[in-house]
């Protein structure tokens, strides 16, 4: 169990799964830069991040910007939305002070793009589900994404594999945070979409040393 002082931002687990160096630059050195993708994501979340907004649509209720945390993972953050689905079975349900009955909580994340080929988004969603499980002593079987580009909802099963990835990522994040060491860059196709590319300088790794990088890129 991690203490309150040791908690890390849950949203960082997506950055970490995408690239450990990107996560460390953001969370250890407070580096940030914008690109088209980050700006589009912010615009989408302007319509989501209202903690006082509650929506009842049919049988289910949507809560916005819900605070969540896990001492076991050492992560805290805010879920874009939690959908409360009515249930006649009290198993794995929660109660809400304003809405009588038993409710199955489903974490929902809003993303501006479309489903990715890797599981970086799913890992973040699984971490949110695991926070809810710890907070309410329940089992959360699935979560969902709403992707702005395709205007479509995608449900995701919170599998044992995703849970293992979350635990391993959280453990590694805490180890790096304690060491204060920035991981080396690992250049790949993912670098092209990273807003920190000009700060990270992944090309340096291809040069072997700083002198070679300066000769090939700055002093030529």
Question: Which residues does each predicted region cover?
Answer:
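Short, charged low-complexity intrinsically disordered segments located at boundaries
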Residues: 44-47, 53-58, 155-163, 195-207
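Short, intrinsically disordered, charge-biased short linear motifs at domain edges
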Residues: 3-6, 172-188
